[in-house]
């Protein structure tokens, strides 16, 4: 059977992560809110396909939250500031796992940007690490927006980062959260990318975003986050991908009809794809 995808994406294989050479960083500046994580610097070997990648990570902890910061090899506190991005893991996953399959560390070294890998908390009633965008139901007081905005503000204050070029990319639930950030702290997010994510009904119905570039990568036969979405009788769930693209096309004042490019079956396994681009009529 021929399977059709919006975009054909090859993800790296997750194998593991090692670390050595710990040192403490203690000269960070706290936010006015009191957010001031303590960071440890260590050399990490991230095992991804086809070969391990080595780099220096900063693991930052508050009393109940954690995130990692990766600075490019040529990072400097003087001179031009660096763009930065969140890389958000999926439901039940971890920041370290996300670090392994995304390959952003290598890309950061090549293209000079900073990557932040935050760690989600366990859902209070469902279990499993997550980002709270309400797509998996009520009974959850975790404030993911507050945490991620604090991390964004803190790294902007403590590293040479251009806060006018801050982005978010996420896998599955991390994709949901990237949309949620674009809706809730819209002035701080330049663009987002979602891989197999969507928008929760709550995000969709309450989104107050300024024009923001988005990229969605999704399988049309995805059974975990179905392409057509799913909403319960109580209104909990997430929107279909066509609805999400229509929302952002309108929000960004884009052409009604996208340009469409067929993607070839380069693996000869019956899987093809379609690339759709909605161009904005304004400068974003």
Give the ranges of each region predicted by the language model.
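N-terminal cap/lid segment of alpha/beta-hydrolase-fold proteins
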Residues: 31-76
